[in-house]
Amino acid sequence: MTFAFTGFVSFGLPEDLVITLEEKFINEGSPKNLSLFYDAAPGCREAHGGNHLAHRGLIRRIHGGHLDLNRKLAALCSENAMPVFMVPQDVNSHLLRAIAGGEPGIVTKIGLKTYADPRQDGCRANQAAWDCGETVVELLNIDDKEYLFYKTFPIDICFIKGTTADTDGNVTVEHEAVLNPILELAVATHNSGGKVIVQVDRLAQAGTLKPKDVKVPGLLVDAIVVGKPENS
């Protein structure tokens, strides 16, 4: 099962949802063996975000954009507790759109002749990524020009963060400091047949939100959780 969530450092983190996931694993031993995807860097050194997921058995694989802001996950990466692939953030953003559109992947020059190039590390961040035999990127030659092909994958469940949701599930982001790709992730998950759970600061009645303020339409949202003020 592939699980994804948004966040850029501590901005736009669905913190209550991630904490609840951690507590459920600690108390019940499930879910487990999740394949984790995030586009950027959702965490803050040794607290918040992905650091709550740093438990052996909870995460079996990581596909992300940056690991240093999730120090506890980074420690597990160094211990080869799971395969870790670090993919350029811009590629991850485009992958969400490609997943939403049902495409097999994206073709781009981003990452050529860098660690992302399969002739070098192919986005592998630890030995476990080499040992697992999986690949996330391939080298293509089109009209005598080199490109990289990054593969898409289905997303089974995602957590996103908004400010307000109405009772129909429409989400606005008026108090969010960073506009994370919550729409792209929601569409990618929905079109994969997955579930979209949103954490918000408050709940409003249907019909009270201005249509132009809505960032994620309610038809994409499966569940709404009103979070704690300290985790907004």
Set out the residue ranges of the language-model regions.
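Conserved alpha/beta enzyme-core scaffold
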Residues: 1-232
